[in-house]
Regions:
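Conserved NTP-binding/hydrolysis module of P-loop NTPases
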Residues: 68-86
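Conserved P-loop NTPase "ATPase switch" module shared by AAA+ and STAND
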Residues: 95-121, 125-128
Length: 211
């Protein structure tokens, strides 16, 4: 009898690509955007990366309550252990004092962010770039992330030009091999693997196969 236990991390095709995007941004600095349908392994990639590079990776998970520049900066300051001063300029300076060359900040659920948020965060990366240092900032969320940021608008062009990568993924890109990696216990059980692959390519994504 087969008994399934969830794997902590499987290097699936999409999750692996998102991991690589984070890595490139970490090494080169600047901004990167990776977004896609729910349940394709985005958060799994973030957790794996943060575990592998725990000393210089900061993860911030956004939500609808964290609206406005001050809320964003207060949240980031809290993650960095910086003083949450009352004014935005003081917050900015407090955050800079905690950031160091060679760090990467990953924003999960980035669809809750605005173009203004991105501009403020880019200023941190620019600050380090001007000193010949690197600070990578990665935005990860659903496809709305790109559209809400205004990727088709002229005012986004400057940010897009400064962005290392912008990638959008969908459940339709999930590979059969991904299911085999997630369910090694099903080796040789082609019918079951094909069924799970079919589920994974729906709106449920990979998450739908393990829940």
């Amino acid at each position: 009898e087969l008994t399934y236990s969830e794997i902590d991390y499987a290097n699936t095709s999409i999750s692996g690509q998102i991991y690589d995007i984070i890595r490139i941004c970490h090494v080169k600095g600047g901004l990167a955007i990776a977004c896609g349908d729910a349940g394709i392994g985005k958060t799994k990639a973030i957790r794996k990366y943060a575990s592998d590079y725990s000393t210089n990776t900061v993860v911030v998970t956004m939500n609808p309550c964290l609206t406005g520049v001050k809320s964003l900066l207060c949240t980031l300051a809290g993650r960095l252990g910086a003083d949450r001063s009352h004014s935005i300029p003081d917050l900015w300076n407090a955050i800079v004092s905690k950031l160091t060359d060679g760090m990467v900040i990953i924003f999960d659920e980035a669809q809750h962010m605005t173009l203004k948020d991105i501009e403020i965060l880019r200023s941190f990366s620019d600050y380090f770039n001007d000193m010949g240092q690197t600070l990578g900032i990665v935005f990860i969320g659903n496809p709305e992330t790109v559209y809400k940021m205004g990727v088709k608008k002229a005012e986004f062009a400057q940010i897009a030009n400064r962005t290392k990568q912008i990638k959008i993924y969908s459940t339709s890109e999930i590979q059969r091999e991904d299911i085999e990696k997630l369910f090694p216990i099903l080796e040789g059980h082609d019918k079951e693997i094909d069924l799970l692959w079919k589920i994974a390519k729906t709106h449920q994504g990979i998450r739908g196969t393990v829940n």
